[in-house]
């Protein structure tokens, strides 16, 4: 392809609305254009990258026995009501009515549709296991679409669904997909880490892992152990209770005046104690239920853990000041567990019962209790892991200090179990004619998100640095002066030779200054650049530059195409 023929409108200025590097560079490099909030058009070079990621995904899904299907985007509401997710999904579900006022949604995911298909087609254990996948547009009515392709209203995903006879079969399917995902992201040239994760709205009773592309700009925090294979999203990471320090109080707890101290920091400073000596008490409302959640004062409540342990809830949130006043008779800053109403469930994090003595709110303005002993001076109805983990805490598997990194979720694998097959009656008959629900797994990859994540991980001040396997083209040939016959003809000849060898090459045949061509090449992120100039041609050589390392080599004209072909084959793993 010739640059003069490509629709590739590059920009020198950073778009005002682009907050993250990937969004900025996708627009500046002429790969996408915004159609509406969270909705984008893919231009030719952007679509080439997308198709390459899709092809890698297809090859690995097919290699594991997956069969490709195409499921409808528009899904009937009755299927979502059968599964119980029509209301659970909330406002992010894009809903619409047809002319007959029948309700539908634009699919954010396809568990209901695929399970409905299977219940109509699968009858016998002999038809299992089954792996079906699609690459399809998905829709989510994000309240605030942002970050370009990272969080849009329309996005492209691969989702595969496995159907097995039993949990052992599901475990085998899960491992197949886990291994396939590892190969996919390795082939894409990305640095990533699989981590234990939360199942979210998709649900299920089994395990789940997220595949995180590591990048400093990542919106998700992950913790991992450098000494064993433990890694988890902070939403899921297990916490080991910290060792207890201090002695139990000699006498009973007592009330103290704490005027104007509504925060943990203010109370700790006023009483000259550590934040870890305080009990943080927060009233949560899960749908129509109320819970008093207790954690140590230096810890943060993990609402994902709270929802999973006590719910799931359609809406879990901190109770408003008016509810706190009605139930506990005080402002939120003075809430405490001593004397909590019997109809209020008190749930404590694992560390709270281990505290020798504690400072807590007295449920009265400007008052706190000191020397309170958990489970002696106040009741605890449930004890659960409810807090966020921090870097430096002990690994739950081996005890080594955990480290933290930032990541971008690009894939997730779920063990759904029988959540959807029971709800939608997708059953099969075993060898004895007994009926059983299919045991399901769900495995998603954000294809368009992977494209953005690759840029977040691979960029510099000049633009994108595409890994060779997913680059729009492998090499760009840049004749620096199109008016010089030798330069122009050599560039053309090298371009044609590269094409004959199967190298994806593009020729910058524009009558532009060399600086403009070089800036565009770096911005778009072609992995290799061949510069054809009169000075090097005088010695029978051209310049070969590696975009990632910046390394420049002078290569004989007659050796160039073969050299590049070898580099590309090595990067693609072709023998």
From Swiss-Prot:
Entry's Gene Ontology cellular component terms: cytosol
Cell division in keyword set: no
EC class: ligase
Keyword tags: Aminoacyl-tRNA synthetase, ATP-binding, Cytoplasm, Ligase, Nucleotide-binding, Protein biosynthesis
NCBIfam families: PRK09194.1 (NF006625), proS_fam_II (TIGR00409)
Family assignment from sequence similarity: Belongs to the class-II aminoacyl-tRNA synthetase family. ProS type 1 subfamily.
This protein's name: Proline--tRNA ligase
Source species: Desulfitobacterium hafniense (strain DSM 10664 / DCB-2)
High-level lineage: Bacteria, Bacillati, Bacillota, Clostridia, Eubacteriales
């Amino acid at each position: 392809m010739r640059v003069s023929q490509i629709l590739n409108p590059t920009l020198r200025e950073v778009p005002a609305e682009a907050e993250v590097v990937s969004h900025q560079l996708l627009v500046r490099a002429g790969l996408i254009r915004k159609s509406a909030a969270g909705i984008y058009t893919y231009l030719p070079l952007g679509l080439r990258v997308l198709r390459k990621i899709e092809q890698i995904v297809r090859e690995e899904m097919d290699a594991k026995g997956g069969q490709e299907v195409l499921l409808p985007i528009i899904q009937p509401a009755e299927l979502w009501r059968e599964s119980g997710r029509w209301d659970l999904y909330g406002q992010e579900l894009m809903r619409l009515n047809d002319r007959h006022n029948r309700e539908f949604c634009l699919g954010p995911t396809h568990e209901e549709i695929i399970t409905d298909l299977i219940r109509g087609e699968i009858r016998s254990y002999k038809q299992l296991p089954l792996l079906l996948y699609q690459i399809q547009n998905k829709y989510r009515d994000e309240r605030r679409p942002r970050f370009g392709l990272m969080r849009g209203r329309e996005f492209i995903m691969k989702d595969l669904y496995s159907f097995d006879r039993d949990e052992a079969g599901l475990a085998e399917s899960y491992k197949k997909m886990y291994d396939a995902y590892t190969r996919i992201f390795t082939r894409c040239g990305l640095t990533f880490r699989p981590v234990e994760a939360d199942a979210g709205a998709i649900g299920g009773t089994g395990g789940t892992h997220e595949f995180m592309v590591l990048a400093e700009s990542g919106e998700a925090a992950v913790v991992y152990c450098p000494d064993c294979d433990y890694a988890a999203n902070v939403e899921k990471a297990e916490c080991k209770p910290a060792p207890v320090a201090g002695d139990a109080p000699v006498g009973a707890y007592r009330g103290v005046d704490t005027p104007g101290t509504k925060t943990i920091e203010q109370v700790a400073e006023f009483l000259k104690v550590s934040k870890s000596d305080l009990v943080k008490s927060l009233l949560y409302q899960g749908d129509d239920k109320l819970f008093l959640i207790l954690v140590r004062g230096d810890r943060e409540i993990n609402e994902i853990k709270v929802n999973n342990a006590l719910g799931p809830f359609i809406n879990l949130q901190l109770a408003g000041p008016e509810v706190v006043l009605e139930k506990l008779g005080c402002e939120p800053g003075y809430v405490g567990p001593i004397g909590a109403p019997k109809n209020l469930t008190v749930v404590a994090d694992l560390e709270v019962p281990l505290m020798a003595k504690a400072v807590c709110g007295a449920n009265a303005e400007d008052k706190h209790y000191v020397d309170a002993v958990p489970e002696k001076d106040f009741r605890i109805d449930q004890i659960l892991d409810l807090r966020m983990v921090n870097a430096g805490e002990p690994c739950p598997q081996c005890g080594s200090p955990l480290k933290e990194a930032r990541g971008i979720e690009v894939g997730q694998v779920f063990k759904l179990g029988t959540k959807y097959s029971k709800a939608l009656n997708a059953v099969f008959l075993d060898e004895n004619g007994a009926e059983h629900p299919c045991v399901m797994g769900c495995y998603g990859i954000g294809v368009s998100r992977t494209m953005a994540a690759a840029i977040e991980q691979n960029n510099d001040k000049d633009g994108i640095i595409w890994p060779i396997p997913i680059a729009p083209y492998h090499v760009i040939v840049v004749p620096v002066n199109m008016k010089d016959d030798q330069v122009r003809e050599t560039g053309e000849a090298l371009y044609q030779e590269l094409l004959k060898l199967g190298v994806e090459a593009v020729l910058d045949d524009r009558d532009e200054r060399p600086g403009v061509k070089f800036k565009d090449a770096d911005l778009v992120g072609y992995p290799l650049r061949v510069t054809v100039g009169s000075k090097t041609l005088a010695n029978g050589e051209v310049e070969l530059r590696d975009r990632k390392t910046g390394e420049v080599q002078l290569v004989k004209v007659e050796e160039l195409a073969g050299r590049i072909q070898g580099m590309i084959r090595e990067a693609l793993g072709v023998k």
